[in-house]
Amino acid sequence: MCIRDSFRRMLLSGLLRSPSQLLMVVAMTLFSYYYCDGDLTTAFTDPKKLIIILIIAGGLFIGQFITMAICPALIKKYDVKKIYNIFSGFSAIPYALMFVVYLIAPTNLADIKWVIVDGILFFAAGAGFGAVNVCQSVMISDCIDYEEYHNGYRPDGVFFSGQSFITKFSAGVASIISGYVYNAVNYSDVNIDAMNNAIANGASFASDFSEYSKAMWFLISIPPAIGMAISVIPTLKYEITRESHDKMLKTLVEKHSQPEQQ
């Protein structure tokens, strides 16, 4: 077995997961238009809007931060591969359900019952996003330990540059997908200005610009759901288990604790 296979699997999984970045790219624009008439700052003067944003956006970020906090404890008890695959695979469900909920009530998602439903879905999606990011860093670190154990050197720079590449690639993929979808519904600078003027004069983003609303709900749900689901495929055969890594790490610690021979 080539030890670098583990890193290749992680790199491929990260690239396949790239569309999940759309949630972070598009969400605040969607929240601004759908819930706050194009101006997110109005949430600070309208209690109803503030509650909606706290539930929806708060759910997204709280879910992310909670899993980032508890993942280190989970990793001590379970294989990081298992945690990564579970969160990646199952978080595809809340992503997809966001669009299903939109299709059920496209103009009524500001009603409190739908706000609560979406808040739960955003919380679950954020939890998956946070857990996967933590696990990815840990798994890359494990790959570095394995490389040192088998080949005698630590390719920290090379391997973590791969993680940076995933981040930049994800941003690029998100831009391409969103650009294609926006172009399909004629969401251009001129039309955005016209929409802003119409909303300022009382138009509704959800009702009067439903094609834009649908495009944004699609972007934050379906491509990320697909990306999270297929990102599990490469890591199903990820070779490093918790037991094997503990064994390798113990050997490396003993090696580094020995005084260098003169």
Which residue ranges define each predicted feature?
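Membrane-embedded alpha-helical bundles of multi-pass transporters/translocases
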Residues: 4-262
